[in-house]
């Protein structure tokens, strides 16, 4: 089972690497030490830039023509992604970076990320199931949020055709019971490590709230979505997937993703980059010069 943490008081200032912040977000799902180096990046991110606040993992929408705030989140245990709280600007900004094409540095960075992909959470078990099609569910919060984000009928059909469903580490006990009953031996428990399964599958299905599609892209897997076509809200990584899809660049998804790690204007900062502060400063300078902000 996932290891448990002691009781902690609520955080009054959420920040990457803060144990209380992560406890309130993930409960008893303990984050792996593989995430620890990210603090070397997040500690350099200012609380305010271009006259607006920067917050960890908090999402909202600004008016379409300007930025009222920024958010940042961690992904793949090696990356901090900074983006404006404005989906239209977020997508366009990433498209502009992708069109610049990948550099040698960007390609080297994604190669290192690929070589070191690992689970974000400490999980106890590995599975030797013969998984070809793997469905990766989001946490309980998105299974239940405003009617749910997943197309459960599509998942049922995929399971009938032989797909396995991997439960998210943050899955409530009652949902574990319901989903195990629904999909039987095709349902993989939340305590089972994801990446050994992802590395051997042929195709991965995911929601746009999940970073898993980026992992699958790096691993050269076929990908598919399980999002409901009509749902409220936007996924954490939805602007990234939309930019990769809509950029109009005729190249592999791998190289498009490498382009985001090539140019600091994208807001992607990885532990394998040489100068974190320079990338952060260039990003906010670019955003100030290119887009309107709240006055």
Name these PLM-found stretches.
Residues 78-125, 233-295:
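Leloir-type glycosyltransferase catalytic cores
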Residues 192-239:
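A donor-sugar binding/catalytic signature common to diverse glycosyltransferases
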Residues 121-131, 184-187, 191, 229-231:
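Catalytic phosphate/metal-binding cores of nucleic-acid and nucleotide-processing enzymes, i.e., regions
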Residues 15-20, 61-63, 143-145, 171-178, ...:
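Short, charged/polar "capping" segments at the starts of alpha-helices
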Residues 6-14, 136, 153-190:
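Catalytic donor nucleotide-activated moiety binding site of glycosyltransferases and closely related
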Residues 65-76:
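Phosphate/adenylate-binding glycine loop and adjacent helical scaffold
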Residues 1-52, 141-143, 148, 282-295:
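N-terminal pre-catalytic "stem/leader" segment of glycosyltransferase-like enzymes
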Residues 9-14, 56-60, 132-142, 167-169, ...:
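Short loop/turn segments at strand-loop or loop-helix junctions that form parts
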């Amino acid at each position: 089972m996932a290891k448990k943490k002691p009781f902690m008081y609520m955080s009054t200032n959420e920040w990457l690497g803060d144990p209380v912040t992560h406890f309130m977000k993930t409960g008893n799902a303990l984050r792996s030490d593989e995430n620890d180096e990210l603090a070397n990046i997040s500690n350099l991110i200012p609380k305010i830039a271009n006259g607006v606040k920067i917050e960890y993992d908090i999402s909202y929408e600004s008016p379409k023509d300007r930025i009222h705030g920024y958010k940042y989140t961690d992904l793949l245990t090696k990356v901090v992604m900074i983006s404006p709280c404005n989906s239209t600007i977020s997508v366009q900004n990433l498209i502009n970076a992708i069109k610049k094409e990948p550099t040698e540095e960007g390609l080297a960075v994604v190669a290192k990320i690929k070589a070191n992909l690992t689970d974000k959470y400490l999980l106890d078990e590995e599975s030797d199931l013969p998984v070809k099609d793997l469905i990766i569910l989001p946490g309980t919060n998105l299974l239940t949020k405003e009617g749910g984000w997943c197309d459960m009928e599509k998942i049922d059909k995929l399971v009938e055709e032989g797909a396995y469903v991997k439960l998210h580490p943050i899955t409530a006990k009652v949902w574990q019971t319901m989903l195990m009953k629904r999909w039987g031996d095709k349902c993989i428990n939340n305590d089972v490590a994801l990446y050994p399964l992802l590395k051997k599958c042929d195709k991965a299905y995911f929601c746009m709230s999940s970073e898993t599609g980026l992992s699958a892209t790096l691993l050269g897997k076929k990908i598919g979505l399980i999002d409901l076509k009509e749902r409220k809200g936007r996924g954490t990584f939805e602007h990234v997937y939309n930019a990769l899809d809509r950029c109009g660049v005729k190249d592999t998804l791998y190289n498009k993703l490498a382009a985001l790690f090539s140019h600091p204007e994208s807001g992607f900062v990885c532990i394998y980059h040489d100068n974190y502060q320079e990338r952060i400063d260039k990003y906010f300078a670019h955003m100030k010069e290119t887009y309107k902000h709240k006055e």
